[in-house]
Amino acid sequence: PFTTWVQIVYDWLDALKDPNGLKTFVNTTLGETWEEAVGEKLDHQVLMDKVVRYTAAVPSRVVYLTAGIDSQRNRFEMYVWGWAPGEEAFLVDKIIIMGRPDEEGTLLRVDAAINKKYRHADGTEMTISRVCWDTGGIDGEIVYQRSKKHGVFRVLPVKGASVYGKPVITMPKTRNQRGVYLCEVGTDTAKEILYARMKADPTPADEATSYAIRFPDDPEIFSQTEAQQLVAEELVEKWEKGKMRLLWDNKKRRNEALDCLVYAYAALRVSVQRWQLDLAVLAKSREEETTRPTLKELAAKLSGGVNGYSR
C-alpha cells in the first residue's frame, strides 16, 4: 500500500527495537526478502591450520579416491579427495581445465584428469573410483555423454537440490531417457555435515581421526584461495512469504572448491549406499595385500635365500 517516506522512517525506527519487527518491516514495507545469519561465518584460517605434509601424493591411510567436477561456462574445476576409515578426508589434487565446455579438446583434457593415476604412500598406484559431475550451468548432454564414455556407474551426472533435509545423494534405480543415472545431491545437507567437520579442531597428521579434513602442504593444490572458497558460504534464515527457510548463501563469493567437495563427498556416500563400500574393510584388505610376499620373494624363500629372501 502507498505510504510516505516519513512513515517509512518511523516504521524503521520502531522495527529496530525488535528483530521480529525488523523482519516484518523488510518483508512488508520494503517488499524484500529478510535474511539472517544463523551461525558465525567460518574463518578460512581454520582450514589453513589443517595443512599437513603428505609423504606421497596419496597419504598412507587413504583407501578410496573420489572426485567432484564443477561445470562453468569457460572451464571445469575438479578436486580429488582421498578417504580413510571413519571418513577421514585428504585433499589429493586440484585440476582446472580451461576452455569451452562443449569443445571436444576441453573434454579430452577432462577425460585425462578423470583417468589420472596417483602414487600411494605404499608405492602402488590409485585411480579415481567414482566421480560426481555437475550438470548445472551447461548442457547436461555433455556430462551424460562422458558418463557413458567412462562408465555410467563411475561418472555420475548430478544436479543440486537446495532443500534442507534432503539426503546427501539420491541415485535413481533406473537410467533416464538419455541412458544415465542423473543423481540428486542434497547440497544443503552435505554442506551442513562438511562445515561441521571443517570447523573441528585440527589433530596431528599421524593420528587417524574420524571425520577429520586434511589439506596438503602444496600451494599448487591448496592455498588461501581454496580455503576461502571452502568457507565462502554461511547458513542464513530467509523469510519468504511468511515462511522461514534455511539455506546456504555464498553472498556472491567464489565457492567452486566447496561445490567440488560436496560432489566428491556425494560420490563417497553413493558408493557406501549403492555398492556397500566399507572403508575399514577396504583398509584391512589393502594392508593384507601390501604385506603379502610377492612371487619373487616366495621363490627366493623356497630356494633358501638369506633370512628366507635372496640378496
PLM segments and residue spans:
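Metal-dependent catalytic core segments for phosphate chemistry
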Residues: 18-23, 31-40, 71-113
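Short His-Asn-centered micro-motif
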Residues: 69-71, 129-136, 158-159
